Amino acid sequence: MARFWDGCKKSIYVVLFAVVIPLSAYIFYGALDTLDGAAALQGLLHGKMVPAVLLGTSFLLGLFLLGVFRRLIPEIEKRARWAVPALIALMALLQILTVLLIRTSLRYDHLKIFDTAAALLEQDTVADTHFRSYFMKYPNNLPMCLFTYFWLRLAQLLHIPRDFWMEYVKLINIVFMNLGMWCGYRILCRHRSRGAGIRYLLLLLVNPLWYLLVEMYYTSTLSLAFSMGAIWVFDCAGRTRSRRKKYLLYFLTGILLAAGYEIRATVIITAAALLVYAALQVKSLGDLKKTGAVLAVLLGAVLALGIYGKAEERYAGFDPSETGYPTVHWIMMSFQGDGQYNSADDAYTGSFSTKEERTEADVQRLRERIGQMGPGGLLTLFRNKLRVAFSDGTDDYASLFLTMRETSPVQKYMNGSRGDYLAFYLHGYHGLLCGLVLLAFLFRAFRGKRCFLDVVSLNLCGAYLFYLIWEVDDAYSIPFMLLFLMMEAVGMELVEDGFARIQEKARTVRFAPAAAAAGLLAVFAGVAAVGRSGAPVREYAVLQDQETSRDLLLQTDFSQTFRTGKPFDHVDLWVANWDGAANDSVYELRILEEDGTVAARAEIIGAQAPCINAYTVSFARVVPEAEQTYTLEIRLTNPDCAIKTDFLYYGTGVWDMYGDGALYAPEEIPNVDLAFAVYEQK
């Protein structure tokens, strides 16, 4: 029986690496075949030039970092007692400065969650808030909303200014992200080497996403603490001799897994990875020593789920099991295009009144799509989904952080017209990461020994397989970013060992990192030359592009104030033109200074207006003598027109998206702002 069980365990490992290695190889190829976010470079590089340039950049970056790390790591190891905390503190400081100096607004689902959590401070249930329909469809985000509500209630008790609440929750995000990071460091130090743990920290230090993603505040980033924490606590439990402490740690593991699952469903993959790993540690099928550990984990999970269930019952105001979309909806939606969100599928599922009808309809449509695709179509879909979820090095940061609560000079370099530098670096870095992860998997499969880090391999394998059947998005790899970085650190350590052996035979190789640094400078000089010849640069004075409407209609006369001391010559207004060229409305736009002087004037033609997009108006450059409050007036010049244009605004009545101005229609409407942007285009 023992021999049979050993054979089963070997088979599991064979299947694991037979899956994870080819999928990682394809993801690596995909990482070298995309320039998303680098608009100027996309216009210059085509076909095989893209992977050739990115492969070269990734190689140069890896060689340069290898040289730097070889010098730094021994010094940090000697002074690890204070150097490692100092390194972590440096990264945390950079994250905090990112939040405080680049004041972006939450957007999309993130904003809905935050706004609703703020509304719960005054309302009894989510059902009483503006976004109740959203949470009725997607109750999976209710835990995140209640989590945010807890922190906002604390902010209220501590008298933290309301205008700082978005930055406040992002600081909470930093805490949870760094808890996850610390757990990864401890696991690597324990099961690989302290050097590998320090490499992991240094690789995070030079990863811009580690700072950009603190602006996100969403389930993807917060779940890092729960998934990584569960792995670390599980490991500590297995190494503890005290039975009482051991079961307490397993109990805590269950709490972390259940709480993390409620925050982000992908934590279930971590739970599955730990379960499989625990099964692989059983010496024989008759060995029941692990039963107590399993029961402790289950007890912790049941307790956490029970507590959340009571909280949901208190604050939801509806039955999520009846109103929520069925699980099969996300599977069905993923079997089209590249597997991403599709508004038509959302509307299709929402058109049915009961959950049973929605489930039956989604299952039927899923069957139809699978039948139409056939084996070849499914293979293409799976390849595309892997690339969307794991090959993109930007994690869609450019769109996630577009709305600026305060204008920042770095905005154009982060996600504006000079964003090629950052996007190109991220793609090069991601190519390096994917290559080193593949190397680590190959080494483990053919030359490595079984160890606790196999949990990481199992987790990433589960992530790959999960997104073959689930809806995907560019940002959906974020819950696994620390696991990828752990494997990247292992891969970097393997490369360094090989480099040291080569250097013993060829001393001139020691100059390779310096040559790589020179090569990187040349590459980015080329990127700079291309970028400066690209699209015009926008210097924003105001950027508030989020919209959600209530019963207010902005179709005739209204105004919006804004404050700036920067020059501007363009205004973007987000509008909805439902009738296209048949829209016969005409509006006059005027921008008034504080003394009532007309600073700019333009015309808005309804027939030329887009639908749910920005209408751009240009005029002569306005140069303020000093910072002042301007008034943007919109007036319908032909009131007898048959069709009017809808001007969009953000108006839940809870959160003020633009604190330096107000909307008047004709009286001031509190906490409501036009969806608009004011900028100078150079």
Feature locations, PLM:
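Loop-to-helix entry region of an early transmembrane alpha helix in multi-pass inner-membrane enzymes
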Residues: 138, 142, 157-182, 423-428
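Membrane-interface anchor segments at the N-terminal boundary of transmembrane helices
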Residues: 43-56, 168, 384-460
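Transmembrane-helix signature of polytopic, membrane-embedded enzymes
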Residues: 179, 184-206, 244, 449-458
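Transmembrane-helix motifs of polytopic, lipid-linked glycan transferases
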Residues: 67, 168-191, 229, 436-442
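Start-transfer (signal-anchor) and selected internal transmembrane alpha helices
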Residues: 1-97, 287-299, 512-515
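Short hydrophobic/aromatic helix or loop-helix immediately within or flanking a transmembrane segment
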Residues: 116-118, 133-161
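Multi-pass, polyprenyl lipid-linked donor-dependent membrane glycosyltransferases
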Residues: 169-176, 199-234, 263-270, 476-481
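Membrane-proximal stem/loop segments at transmembrane-domain junctions that anchor or position
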Residues: 123-128, 312-405
